[in-house]
Regions:
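Terminal amphipathic alpha-helical/low-complexity segments used for targeting or macromolecular assembly
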Residues: 1-113
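Structural signal for interior beta-strand "rungs" in well-ordered beta-sheet cores
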Residues: 115-140
């Protein structure tokens, strides 16, 4: 299952951040996400997750914006997406959280543990983070 989940996260990253990763065929990646999810969950849950990808992407873009707008060391948003470990963690968390909400067993916890192992940052898939808004004191 871990190999499937690792592949899922590669696809989710490309699906959510195509503008930063030179994505060529987002529709193909979404179909691949659905295919992987059908191996770990039933068809209804897989389809429900795919329907939530636009909202997951929106939330992750607000995460990127909050970092880019508040960290004076940031050069641009591409740097945040490619280099900041917290974005990897948030991608795993937001994916895992959605799967948990849909009642998919085991996979949500494995996803957050994969991110924890890679970054040292641990967020339980049941945590409620919500939208991260840019600060009113963001740099100009």
């Amino acid at each position: 299952m871990e190999e499937l989940l690792a592949e899922l996260m590669v696809l989710m990253r490309r699906t959510v951040f195509p503008e930063f990763l030179g994505q060529e065929d987002r529709d193909l990646d979404v179909m691949s996400v659905r295919s992987i999810l059908r191996k770990i969950a039933d068809e209804g849950r897989a389809d429900a997750f795919v329907a939530r990808i636009p909202e997951i992407a929106r939330l992750l873009h607000t995460d990127v914006d909050a970092i880019a707008d508040n960290d004076p060391a940031v050069i641009d948003r591409t740097e945040v997406v490619l280099c900041y470990p917290c974005i990897k963690v948030m991608l795993h968390y937001r994916t895992a959280h959605e799967l948990l909400q849909l009642g998919v067993p085991v996979a949500p916890r494995l996803l957050t543990e994969m991110a924890h192992s890679a970054t040292g940052i641990d967020i339980h898939p049941g945590a409620r983070i919500g939208e991260i808004s840019p600060s009113t004191t963001a740099r100009a």
